[in-house]
Curated annotation (Swiss-Prot):
Protein name: Cell division protein ZapA
UniProt keyword Cytoplasm present: yes
The keyword Cell division belongs to this UniProt entry's keyword annotation: yes
Function of the protein: Activator of cell division through the inhibition of FtsZ GTPase activity, therefore promoting FtsZ assembly into bundles of protofilaments necessary for the formation of the division Z ring. It is recruited early at mid-cell but it is not essential for cell division.
Length: 85
């Protein structure tokens, strides 16, 4: 459903349904939700005794860590490209 450039979709993350509204496509939002779900399940396999809140926070920390590593790699590549110009 698109309303004023916004898309609404329902996704399932770790057994819970969430309605998400954003400017990206439904496919993109579902892909993001799938990655979050996969990451939560991966962390839960290693730490099965975490409650849902701690699992969610640990997942967020891990995802931001991965994001920052990729951002750093991207910035290094940008510098290398500029040096070659």
């Amino acid at each position: 459903m698109s309303d004023g450039g916004k898309t609404k979709t329902t996704v399932e993350i770790y057994g819970q349904s969430y309605t998400i509204i954003g400017q990206e496509t439904k496919m993109h939002m579902r892909h993001v939700a799938s990655i979050v779900d996969d990451k939560m399940r991966e962390i839960n396999e290693k730490n099965p005794y975490l409650d849902i809140n701690k699992l969610a926070v640990l997942t967020a920390v891990n995802v931001v860590h991965d994001y920052l590593k990729l951002k750093e790699q991207y910035e290094k590549l940008e510098i290398q490209l500029k040096e070659k110009e």
